[in-house]
Amino acid sequence: MANVVVVGAQWGDEGKGKIVDWLSEQADIVVRFQGGHNAGHTLVINGETYKLALLPSGVLRPSKLAVIGNGVVFDPQAFLDEVKKLQAQGVAISPENLRVAENVTLILPLHRELDAQRETAAKAGAIGTTQRGIGPAYEDKVGRRAIRLMDLADLAALPPKIDRLLAHHNALRRGLGLPEIDGAAILNELAALAPQLLPYAETVWRLLDIKRREGKRILFEGAQGALLDVDHGTYPYVTSSNTVAAQAATGTGMGPSSVGYVLGICKAYTTRVGAGPFPTELKNEIGEEIGRRGKEFGVNTGRKRRCGWFDAVLVRQTVRTCGIHGLALTKLDILDGFETIEVCVGYRLDGKEIDHLPAGEGAQARVEPIYETIEGWKEPTANARSWADLPAQAIKYVRRIEELVGCPVALLSTSPEREDTILVQNPFEA
């Protein structure tokens, strides 16, 4: 299989950035296909820490082409700020090695403001968004009133499009008690951004098709996790895009047959940010300890992540909904030293045992985890780079996860460092 799709197999924050960076050494092109700058990830390379949000991890690899696909919602200012920050760290970024789909939807300041107003007004019922305008931008895309990158190339044709956008947003703003927005202000802002953004614009579906036919290896980089998918996740506590592997085709303009191996990323435990059901959440000292060891705070927002035991039911479900061929298991080292480790192997709902997470919000909140206790290990797994470096009990834990989710572990990560990775099966050669 020449192409590889990387998706999160939990609620995001699984360590996709490191795995994508590790795989990108073998890829020619790295493509983002959904989400926006709400999904941050941290990479540590030769002791230097890089924090990415919107840009594909491939930008950190010299000679690789990084691409932002049409399935992404694109904040122009966030993009320019991130490029500038990475350039200050010595990363070479230019239109030569970074391309952006011309039909990508733009996130504007009005989207961010609306996002924040809604979350504030919802109070206890808030979803827990990053308030970066992701959802409102996707709403405008589906509502056929979005401004897209290609629109900046024809400023004379922009006013009617802005008027259509504001007919919707100013009505909302009146209802929220906010002042209306003048279309001229948006036009002036976009006109100022156009010369900075348009050099990156590309007909991405055509570019990728040409590269695929040339035999280039393409790595599709997903954001968030499959359990945040707007259709298959814990709705309504989800993101506003499809995060499952099938979106790699839709979000880039490539056909489904162009997507090869699907690699699912999951932690050796479970975390979640924001509100929503979490069957294995540990609201005790063990959960706090996992959070401290794993440094479980959001890269972009700094929000504390909720922590719990590994949920094999959920990962097995995402293996199916994403068509995952192999898993990359991360942060195994965080579990070093625990006397025993619990793994969720099933649920109990209203007195009955079930083997999947139900779709209903109420039912999701009522499920109770059924645990299997596994013996822990005392020896460290941190920085291990081969199976021989791992304690026998840690290997047993990995093997048990494989059995429970019905999917082999292809990669094992034992620290944030790029080289601390154990390869079992190379996704590009599977």
UniProtKB/Swiss-Prot annotation:
GO terms for molecular function: adenylosuccinate synthase activity; GTP binding; magnesium ion binding. GTP binds at residues 12-18, 40-42, 305, 331-333, 413-415. Substrate binds at V299, N300, T301, G302, R303, K304, R305. Mg(2+) binds at D13, G40. It catalyses: IMP + L-aspartate + GTP = N(6)-(1,2-dicarboxyethyl)-AMP + GDP + phosphate + 2 H(+). Transmembrane segments: none annotated. IMP binds at D13, E14, G15, K16, N38, A39, G40, H41, T130, R144, Q224, T239, R303. The keyword Cell wall biogenesis/degradation does not apply. Plays an important role in the de novo pathway of purine nucleotide biosynthesis. Catalyzes the first committed step in the biosynthesis of AMP from IMP. PANTHER family: ADENYLOSUCCINATE SYNTHETASE. Belongs to the adenylosuccinate synthetase family. This is Adenylosuccinate synthetase.
